[in-house]
Amino acid sequence: MIHTLETTVAGRKMKVDFGKTGMLSNAAIFMSYGDTVVMINANASKEPREGIDFFPLSVDYEERLYSVGKIPGGFIKREGKPSDKSILHARSIDRPLRPLFPKGYRNDVQIVNTVLSVEQDNLPEILAINGSSLALCLSSIPFTTPVAAVSVGLVDGEFIINPTVAQRENTILDLTVCATKERVMMVEAGGQEIDEETMYSAIIFGFEECKNIVAFQEEAVAKFGKTKNEPVLYKADEEVEKEVKSFAFDMIKEAMYIMDKDERNAQLDKVKEKISEEFSEKYEDKGADIAEVIYKTQKEIVRNMLLNEDRRPDGRAFDEVRPISCEVGILPRTHGTGLFTRGLTQVMTVATLGALGDVQILDGIAEEESKRYMHHYNFPSYSVGEVRPLRGPGRREIGHGALAERALEPLIPSQEEFPYTIRLVSEVLSSNGSTSQASVCGSTLALLDAGVPIKRPAAGIAMGLITSEDLEKEKVITDIQGIEDFFGDMDFKVAGTEKGITSIQFDTKIKGLSNSCVKDALEGAKKARLHILGKIKECIPEPRKELSKYAPRTEIICIDPEKIRDVIGAGGKVINKIIADTNVKIEIKEDGKIFVTSNNEPEGVKKAISIIEGLTKEVVQGEIYLGKVTKTTNFGAFVEILPGKEGLVHISKLDFARVEKVEDVVSVGDEILVKVTDIDNQGRINLSRKDAIAKKEEEKDK
């Protein structure tokens, strides 16, 4: 039986159909918002997965190009692996949902979001978060707390829920808020240097709207929800937990209080060896339980240290940033480099400049077709002292790269100001917490070193949180290191300039953040960010005045758009010849702007521009030109005065004396000065060498 429920969000209809599709799924819904339609299917394995110490939740976000009436490019003509944007949207769905599953739940859970129809005014990724929550709540899977999501824009000082395309073009804020009816679960934001107070107000504004969508989900669950399965939750054997904890608690505590990370880990390894020696025979088949007890004991000790003893593992104050060092120009042949070190976290970012033709072409469901600025993030195993095969970028690398990219995007100059494609690559050399925000700092250094005229330097910081079991007591921590992230409750990343915030991403391991916690985190992040920006400015206060000698050079000229066809030529013949003759790259825009780029060949750029100017320049009557003789006849000489533009010098106009034979004065290939004496109504150009000489003599006498 098909059931339908409707509600209104931001003046537009949101509709859900149950029982219409996916009859064999645990839960399947067909959800629409305007003309945007997403199908969500949620399923779980019947039994827990053995031998794992994590919750195996899998979220997929599948974009179908037919949803926007497009056929995929390339030879295969079907969708391939998920795009970076699809991966980012899947991560945005995962983060607010994961903390709300029961602790110890080990059943495989898969949520598949398939985008079927897209109206650009209504973002499918926002609909997918709401639909994923609703599908889980309707299913028999033990998920009982609805989560809602909205997008928030800021146009002319007014907050807007789920802005349309026209509104998104004018917004200075792109914010996604996910929340239960009681607390904020997840925030993603990009902004044009938004102040902390405005950002906080925007988050709360979105939170209030989320409550209405949560109420809609609760209504649907009350009417159509399935009975929930009783979950089988993993828990360490009580006897094992009691004995191991009694034996090892003091030793683990002693190790956890060592401030130096390497020394602490070395001591923990010794403790684990002692535990193994003590219990390997008695509990030879309980290795997973023993590992769980060790983890829980470490977590208990660290959290108590932070929450009740006001002490951090490395001895810092709660609002203190780790020691920072900045370097630039460390690689000799690259266009710009920045090495940023904060404690044991170290990132090297390399900037590369290219022609505008080097932009990344996008083939997705969004209206955006290309990217001129991009940031890529690499996290090799050696950065954490581990050994594992090097693969391509995973979801984490793509997510962290996009986060740092978003932090700097509002600061990148326009292509008119800086006509280059910009690629940043952040190499994580050492990781002990918040490498994504270190990438923001490294990227700023690299851009400044490359001579990119960014509006202002940017920096990023990660804030953490420790809460009591009842969530009544909480402490916000500045610049969390690995151990605080691992055992803590929040990773709240904020990047921006001295003027305001350019990006936020936070998620939590608990059932949401209080409003006061959000505010405290924003304020703490600002203080830390300004401190880091001071260190960056000490290293390199402004962009270099000159580009690297190894960087390409680009010049811009503007022509009449009606003349573009003259530059391109039939089948691209003219432009391809210019490129071949001058060894440059040429990009032509519809408005008549032409970008000419060359790698280390400035003469090639000058030559190409000269040719283009000649092709597009109009012949002016009365002007004098230096032309080349292309043909002689018995009645005169034809002279090319601009590329593709010839005129006739009649034999009587060649010289002051009588000329019997044209070849007595000029030959094919000669360069001569000529004056345009007339352009008839058919466009034919009459020239005079005699008048040009006379005019030059007259100017010389003056």
Curated annotation (Swiss-Prot):
Keyword Magnesium: yes
EC number(s) per entry: 2.7.7.8
Keyword Heme: no
Pfam families associated with the record: KH_1, PNPase, RNase_PH, RNase_PH_C, S1
Reactions listed under catalytic activity: RNA(n+1) + phosphate = RNA(n) + a ribonucleoside 5'-diphosphate
Residue ranges occupied by any KH domain in the UniProt entry: 552-612
Residues annotated for Mg(2+) binding in this entry: 485, 491
Class of this enzyme: transferase
CC terms in the record's Gene Ontology section: cytosol
Example of a GO MF term: polyribonucleotide nucleotidyltransferase activity
Ranges that cross the membrane: none
Cofactor(s) recorded in Swiss-Prot or TrEMBL: Mg(2+)
Role noted for this protein: Involved in mRNA degradation. Catalyzes the phosphorolysis of single-stranded polyribonucleotides processively in the 3'- to 5'-direction.
HAMAP family: PNPase
Family per record: Belongs to the polyribonucleotide nucleotidyltransferase family.
UniProt-recorded name of the protein: Polyribonucleotide nucleotidyltransferase
Recorded name of the encoding gene: pnp
